A protein has these predicted regions:
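Accessory nucleic-acid engagement/destabilization modules that flank
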Residues: 2-271
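Conserved pre-motif I regulatory segment
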Residues: 30, 271-309
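Conserved RecA-like helicase motor-core motifs
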Residues: 49, 359-373
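Post-Walker A helix-loop "phosphate-sensing" segment adjacent to the P-loop in P-loop NTPases
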Residues: 326-334, 356-362
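A short acidic (Asp/Glu
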Residues: 161-162, 321, 347-352
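Residue-level preference for the first positions of well-ordered beta-strands
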Residues: 66, 305-307, 335-337
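Walker A/P-loop
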Residues: 301-325
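Conserved Walker A/P-loop ATP-binding site and its immediately adjacent core
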Residues: 334-357, 370-373
Length: 373
């Protein structure tokens, strides 16, 4: 059985002698590491998955598959010869390139869009086969929005206009484009997406998808960060192995390591809310009119916006904490954050909340985190 061309590319490389194990990690495997984290995070019963799926009017299983497929392509730009030549590896073969890698002008996230553009204009990808009944312009707009959150996994959107893509072609090389095409085909076989359930021709739907992409973008950054932990996702080179490398064989391993990585973060450890009684019981004083309102206002499972405003000293913070406690206890939220204008006000609020949040959450599953960021 012949080795796929995309296994001749590295995605992570050893940076110091302190790093134990192999000198590099195959690009295809790193992509699956990150996709595995996303797959496990966006579980179909996860509140975020359910909320975004509801916004897009699609099944949670489809959202999960779409996110996993897209994350698996997040480092498509690393197929560029200029990137590969940052660390030439003899056993992976030469990667001729016209220019050297330039992290300012042509970082690998930008190169991802450049490769995607070349795959389309050179006919490696035929999106009309995925969307036979949709306008090509709508298809293009959808994929630009889709890869906005994937290629921008370093936290900043990247340019994806045709002019920029053409200018970046010199950093890529023909072999990298061919390998990327083969990789996309095999990834799609692993994570097939029912494109027909996506209403990409509906501008209202596309607007909602772009709104949802903000959530997915933040999640993509998190997944890439966690999936790059070489203490958990050990580097694999496949050198000396009898069997050729395989995405399908590696995938169960990647999912298992993703579970290990997620467990170490404690981010998804379920929290249990203590029952809310009253302002008097929580804070030890009789409620102001605003606080009384916060105790009694109707709360619902659907999204609600509460605006609490009153004179200085009316106890707005306590009212907000009481209302938040009620929402969490009812199962309508599982956490909260405060946004404040300055570091000084944030520091002060952190101290106040630190004294109280233990009355909102139970410690039965371990301590609940409170972070000043």
């Amino acid at each position: 059985m012949e080795t796929k061309s995309y296994f001749n590319y590295w995605g992570k490389a050893k940076k110091s002698a302190e790093h134990k194990g192999a000198d590099y990690h195959l690009l295809a495997y790193h992509c699956l590491d990150v996709a595995a984290v996303g797959h496990q995070v966006l579980d179909e019963n996860n509140a975020l998955c359910l909320d975004v799926a509801e916004l897009l009017a699609i099944p949670p299983s489809l959202l999960r598959q779409l996110f996993t497929f897209t994350l698996a392509l997040h480092d498509l730009g690393k197929f560029a010869a200029s990137f590969q030549n940052l660390k030439p590896i003899p056993e992976l073969g030469d990667k001729p390139c016209l220019v050297n890698y330039d992290a300012n002008l042509a970082r690998h996230d930008k190169l991802g869009f450049a490769i995607w553009h070349q795959l389309l204009i050179q006919g490696y990808l035929k999106l009309d086969q995925w969307f036979p009944n949709d306008d090509p312009i709508d298809v293009k707009d959808f994929f630009l929005a889709l890869f906005d959150f994937s290629f921008a996994h370093h936290g900043k959107p990247v340019a994806h206009d045709k002019r920029t893509a053409k200018q970046l072609k010199k950093y890529v090389g023909d072999a990298g484009i061919e390998a990327a095409a083969e990789f996309i085909q095999d990834v799609y076989q692993m994570f097939p997406v029912n494109w027909q359930q996506l209403a990409i021709g509906d501008q209202n739907w596309l607007t909602r998808f772009k709104q949802a992409s903000w959530y997915l973008s933040g999640l993509a950054v998190f997944c890439d960060w966690l999936g790059s932990d070489n203490q958990i996702f050990k580097y694999h080179t496949e050198i000396g192995k009898i069997e050729p490398p395989s995405l399908k064989r590696y995938w169960p391993h990647a999912k298992g390591q993703a579970n290990v990585a997620l467990a170490r973060t404690d981010l998804f450890t379920p929290t249990t809310a203590l029952p809310f009684d009253s302002i008097k019981q929580q804070f030890g004083f009789s409620p102001s009119p605003l606080q009384k309102w916060a105790e009694q206002v109707e709360i619902k499972s659907v999204g609600q916006l509460f605006i609490l405003e009153d004179i200085t000293g009316a106890g707005k913070t306590e009212a907000a904490l009481a209302l938040t406690h009620r929402l969490i206890a009812a199962g309508y939220a599982d956490g909260f954050y405060f946004g404040l204008p300055t570091m000084a006000t944030s520091n002060a609020m952190f101290g106040r909340v630190a004294e109280h949040y233990g009355k909102i959450f139970s410690n039965e599953n371990g301590p609940v985190s409170l972070v000043l960021a």
